[in-house]
Amino acid sequence: MKTVVFDIETVGMEFSQLDQYSREYFLKFSEQEEIENVHDSLSFYPLTAAVVAIGMMDVQTGEGAVYFQDKGRGLGKTQYNSFHLHPCDELMILKNFWKQLRHYDAFVTFNGRMFDCPFIMIRSIVYGLRIERNLLPYRYSNQEHIDLADQLSFYGCLSRKFPLHLWCKTFGIPSPKEDGISGLEVQNLFRQEQYLRIARYCSQDVVATKLLYDRWLESLAQAS
């Protein structure tokens, strides 16, 4: 069964870009000290953020690609480890994602059901793209979408949710956070026009997810 791992990075719009009613909505239940958190949270929602990178890796071959925004800087295609890095705009990021996904029977994410998948689908609708495949199939089956956050927590049976970093540390897998970057820093990196750093970080997230998938496949898949 051909399988692909993918991960996305997102960046929210500036709070000042929202219209008055939208700003009021986000601030409605916020105390003064929480307002900065409200600004930062815009990256989490497909209505107020854009996809700035999607990384994909073929599980069988280990080859990968990252499609990432460079805001028209003309960086050109480059290579990072086993990943081909392709600069483009958000529309082409999404088009390339759907094009590549056609070649796979199953896909692997970490927390993709709660974040990556609905984000990709909504942003695709924004651009008028046809949703070629339901990225949110029946949750309690791992035949098509293997969301490792679901699988490793036994569908939420653990007392709390744990991030990819903690799962990697527990299983002895190199975490992309060890390079000093996390998803929370992507917004600032994008403002600083460090587009290649975002692309490389995205590829590292994909590699970590793939290695975590390998552990799940070896030890737990048959019991899931």
Task: Please describe what each predicted stretch is.
Residues 1-92, 99:
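Conserved RNase H-like, two-metal-ion catalytic cores of nucleic-acid enzymes
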Residues 2, 49-52, 57-62, 67-83, ...:
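Metal-dependent phosphoesterase core characteristic of DEDDh/y 3'-5' exonuclease domains
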Residues 91-94, 126:
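Extended, compositionally biased low-complexity polar/Lys-Gly-rich tracts
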